[in-house]
Every structure is written in structure tokens, then in C-alpha cells.
């Protein structure tokens, strides 16, 4: 199974003043636009992708995640860090109402897939005209809705979440002042736009989440730790 996410927002706090040993907190939220199975689109006429801009009919699938990281090295424009914790949730909301500008509607109703971030690491590099970075984050799946996901797939499958990062999308970010309740301060924080998709495979592999981003391109891969 594959779930394609629309443009989302990722916020990392305190980037501007970070030093070696600093602990930073990050947050991400988005919504699912399509579902495919064996590379074939699954008909989902009731999947609402318009959020608060719609009449609220059908249902929506939203993603909410948080993570903590410790800066381990700074060398010029490059910062290295290790991931120390966090959480990932996929929500099924029967009253579509997500809003990036209102920072609301992403965690309504129940989570159908929940995971705990248990480790990882990566780096972020800034150049005069572009930036790129990446992280490998290990996630333990804690729970899932068996009415939505096959138990065999959840028990031993491989999940891959790819994410394209476009941090200079000023029009999209213009109305965003917070993510998951955490205010954005331009002078100290990093706020980016991100597109992604979640792939679920029935393959016995550990689950980890790899984030490789650049201005305009990036990759976020999620591989599940066997429970």
C-alpha cells in the first residue's frame, strides 16, 4: 500500500542559536491525497483533501509527528545531530477540517498508526544559495488499527515515507505561524514545506526513517522496527 501526502510543513525550533550539545525540537504535519495498492490507484471517492476549505464531507487522513535531536558537531555551514526521541501518528478524521494557517485539524479523531522514535542521526548543510540535509530515524511501531491495516503487514512489513522539501516556498508558508501548537520565530527557527508518501510492504525489515532534504528535493524513508 502507498499513501501520497500533499504539501505539509516541518518546523525545527532554535536552529539559529544552536551549539554543540544543544537539544532541538521539531514538528511535522500534512495530509494524504491518494492511496495506491500494487502501483494501482485505489478508488476513494470520499477521501477529502481540501480540509477546512471544503464543506467537511467524507473523511481525511492526516500525519502528525514530533522529534528531538541533539547537535553533536558544527563545522562551518554543516551541523551534525543525533535523534533522541519523538512520535509519529497517522489519523483518520471523519470531519475534514485541517488548516495549515489555523494550525488545526491534524490530530482529530483517533490515530490509526502510532510509532515511537527510538534513535537515529543526520546532518544539515547550508550554502549561500541552497541547503540540504538528512537524518536516519529509527521508529518502533506501537499500535495500529487492525480494521485499517493488515496485522501481518504491520507485524513484519517495510514502510517507506518519501518526502520532498521545498523550504523557499514563501507563498505556502506565508500564513503559517505555528506547527502542532508550537510558534514559529523567523529569526531562530527553520520552517519548510514538504511533500511525501508512505509505502507499506509485506517484507520483514526494521523500520527506520531517513530524511534527506535539499532546497527543492529530499527523501524521508520510514522503516519499521519489528515489534
Regions found by a protein language model. Name each.
Residues 1-202:
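Extracytosolic secretory-pathway proteins
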Residues 225-227:
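Membrane-interface capping segments at transmembrane-helix boundaries
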Residues 204-223:
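A short, hydrophobic C-terminal helix/tail in secreted or cell-surface proteins
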Amino acid at each position: 500500500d502507498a499513501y501520497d501526502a500533499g504539501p505539509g510543513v516541518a518546523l525545527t525550533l532554535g536552529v539559529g542559536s544552536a551549539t554543540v550539545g544543544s537539544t532541538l525540537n521539531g514538528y511535522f504535519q500534512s495530509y494524504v491525497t491518494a492511496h495506491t495498492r500494487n502501483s494501482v490507484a485505489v478508488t476513494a471517492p470520499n477521501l477529502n483533501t481540501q480540509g477546512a476549505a471544503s464543506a467537511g464531507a467524507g473523511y481525511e487522513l492526516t500525519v502528525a509527528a514530533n522529534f528531538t535531536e541533539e547537535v553533536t558537531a558544527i563545522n562551518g555551514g554543516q551541523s551534525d545531530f543525533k535523534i533522541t526521541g519523538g512520535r509519529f501518528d497517522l489519523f483518520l478524521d471523519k470531519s475534514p477540517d485541517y488548516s495549515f494557517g489555523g494550525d488545526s485539524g491534524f490530530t482529530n479523531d483517533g490515530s490509526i498508526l502510532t510509532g515511537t522514535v527510538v534513535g537515529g542521526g543526520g546532518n544539515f548543510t547550508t550554502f549561500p544559495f541552497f541547503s540540504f540535509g538528512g537524518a536516519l530515524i529509527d521508529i518502533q511501531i506501537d499500535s495500529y488499527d487492525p480494521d485499517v491495516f493488515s496485522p501481518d503487514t504491520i507485524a513484519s512489513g517495510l514502510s517507506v515515507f518519501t518526502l520532498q522539501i521545498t523550504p523557499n516556498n514563501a507563498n505556502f508558508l506565508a500564513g503559517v505561524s505555528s506547527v502542532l501548537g508550537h510558534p514559529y520565530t523567523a529569526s531562530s527557527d527553520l520552517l519548510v514545506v514538504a511533500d511525501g508518501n508512505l509505502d507499506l510492504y509485506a517484507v520483514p525489515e526494521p523500520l527506520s526513517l531517513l530524511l534527506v532534504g535539499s532546497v527543492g528535493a529530499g527523501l524521508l524513508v520510514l522503516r519499521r522496527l519489528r515489534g
